C-alpha cells in the first residue's frame, strides 16, 4: 500500500481485479466443482459483511492510532471458539481451546506498545476512540466470514469460490468509491494512477494470502485452529520484518523502534509458539 498514493478503496478494487487472472489459472488446475446447496448463501452473506468490515477498517485507521486498533484483530480466534461450533466450522478440544487462547493473547501482546497506560489500554480507549470500537466490530465480523469461507469451500472448491467472491468484492469496492467520492471523502488526486505495478503486487500478494488460507482450511477442517495459525504470521510482520528492516542501512534507522522493543514483544512470541504447539500436538 505504501507504493501508491491512491485511496485505499481504489487500491482494493484494482487489487481484487488483478487477482482474477490468478484465480482463473487456479480454477483451471482444480476444475469447475459441483456446487452444493449452501454455496450461494455463503457468498450472499460474505460479500456485504466483508464490505462492512473493509469500510470499518478504513475508518478506524483514519480516526485512531494504529497502536490502538491493531490488537483487536487478535480477538478473532477467540470469537471463533463460539461462532465456529454454531456455524459448523469445527469443535476444538479443550486443550485446543487453550492453544487458541494462548495465540490470541500472544498476538495481542505483540501489538501492545511499551509505554502505553497498561496492557488493557486499547480496551479502555473504546469509549474514547471510535476507531477502537470499529476494529472490535471487524474482529467480530471476521469470526463470521471465516466460517462462511469454510462453508463455501465445502460446497464448491477454493478457486471457484474466491473467483466469484473476488469479482463481487471488486464491484462493491467500485460502488463504495463512487459513494465516497460523491460525499467528498475521496479527493480527485486519490484517483491518480501513475503505475499499475503497485496494484499488480497488491493483487499478487492478496492472491497468495487467499490461496494459503483456503488451502489450509481444506486440510485442517477446523476454522479456529486455521485462523490461530494464520495469526502467527504477525511474528514475522511485527518482529521479523522490523529486525530485518532496522538492520538495513538503506532505511537509516527508520525501523529502530521495532528493534528496540523486541524484548518487550518476546513474551507475546512465546505465547504464540506455546499455543501453536498445543494445537499441533494436542488439538
Language-model-detected regions and their locations in the chain:
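Cytoplasmic-side transmembrane-helix entry/capping segments in multi-pass membrane proteins
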Residues: 5-17, 64-76, 96-100, 125-136, ...
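Juxtamembrane helix-loop-helix junctions in multi-pass membrane proteins
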Residues: 1-18, 33, 144-169, 220-228
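Specific alpha-helical transmembrane segments that line the substrate/conduction pathway
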Residues: 46-50, 61-107, 162-171, 221-243
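Juxtamembrane boundary at the C-terminal end of a transmembrane helix
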Residues: 219, 277-283
Amino acid at each position: 500500500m505504501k507504493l501508491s498514493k491512491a485511496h485505499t478503496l481504489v487500491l482494493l478494487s484494482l487489487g481484487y481485479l488483478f487477482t482474477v487472472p490468478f484465480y482463473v489459472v487456479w480454477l483451471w488446475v482444480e476444475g469447475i466443482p459441483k456446487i452444493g446447496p449452501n454455496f450461494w448463501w455463503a457468498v450472499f452473506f460474505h460479500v456485504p459483511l466483508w464490505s462492512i468490515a473493509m469500510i470499518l477498517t478504513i475508518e478506524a485507521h483514519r480516526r485512531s492510532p494504529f497502536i490502538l486498533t491493531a490488537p483487536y484483530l487478535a480477538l478473532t480466534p477467540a470469537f471463533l471458539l463460539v461462532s465456529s461450533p454454531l456455524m459448523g466450522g469445527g469443535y476444538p478440544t479443550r486443550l485446543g481451546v487453550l492453544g487458541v487462547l494462548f495465540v490470541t493473547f500472544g498476538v495481542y501482546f505483540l501489538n501492545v506498545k511499551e509505554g502505553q497506560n497498561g496492557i488493557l489500554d486499547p480496551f479502555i480507549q473504546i469509549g474514547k476512540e471510535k476507531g477502537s470500537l470499529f476494529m472490535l466490530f471487524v474482529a467480530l465480523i471476521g469470526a463470521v466470514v471465516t466460517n462462511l469461507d469454510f462453508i463455501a469451500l465445502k460446497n464448491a472448491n477454493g478457486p471457484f469460490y474466491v473467483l466469484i467472491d473476488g469479482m463481487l468484492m471488486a464491484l462493491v469496492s467500485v460502488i463504495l468509491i463512487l459513494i465516497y467520492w460523491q460525499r467528498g471523502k475521496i479527493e480527485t488526486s486519490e484517483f491518480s494512477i501513475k503505475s499499475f505495478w503497485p496494484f499488480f503486487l497488491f493483487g499478487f500478494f492478496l492472491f497468495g494470502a487467499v490461496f494459503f488460507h483456503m488451502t489450509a482450511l481444506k486440510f485442517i477442517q477446523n476454522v479456529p485452529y486455521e485462523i490461530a495459525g494464520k495469526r502467527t504470521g504477525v511474528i514475522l510482520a511485527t518482529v521479523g520484518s522490523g529486525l530485518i528492516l532496522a538492520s538495513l542501512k538503506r532505511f537509516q534507522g527508520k525501523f529502530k523502534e521495532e528493534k528496540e522493543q523486541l524484548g518487550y514483544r518476546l513474551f507475546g512470541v512465546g505465547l504464540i509458539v506455546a499455543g501453536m504447539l498445543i494445537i499441533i500436538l494436542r488439538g
